[in-house]
Amino acid sequence: MAKKNREKIKMISSAGTGHYYTTTKNKRNTPDKLKLKKYDPIIRKHILYNEGKIK
């Protein structure tokens, strides 16, 4: 059985609303933490989302 290259991550809103997106990333190709601008429906704006671990 092959080892999984992609791990599940949680993209957490930097606005502190508690909203998050889940996605996967390749651990080998992107060892650094991700930062993406995505839409936060609670405050209805595009803001920065930071990578966090799924518990």
UniProtKB/Swiss-Prot annotation:
Keywords: Ribonucleoprotein, Ribosomal protein
GO molecular function: structural constituent of ribosome
SUPFAM superfamilies: Zn-binding ribosomal proteins
Domain of life assignment: Bacteria
GO cellular component: cytosolic large ribosomal subunit
InterPro entries given in the database record: Ribosomal_bL33 (IPR001705), Ribosomal_bL33_sf (IPR038584), Ribosomal_zn-bd (IPR011332)
Classification via Pfam families: Ribosomal_L33 (PF00471)
Similarity remark: Belongs to the bacterial ribosomal protein bL33 family.
HAMAP family in the record: Ribosomal_bL33
NCBIfam families: PRK00595.1, rpmG_bact
Protein name from the UniProt record: Large ribosomal subunit protein bL33
Organism: Buchnera aphidicola subsp. Schizaphis graminum (strain Sg)
Lineage of origin: Bacteria, Pseudomonadati, Pseudomonadota, Gammaproteobacteria, Enterobacterales
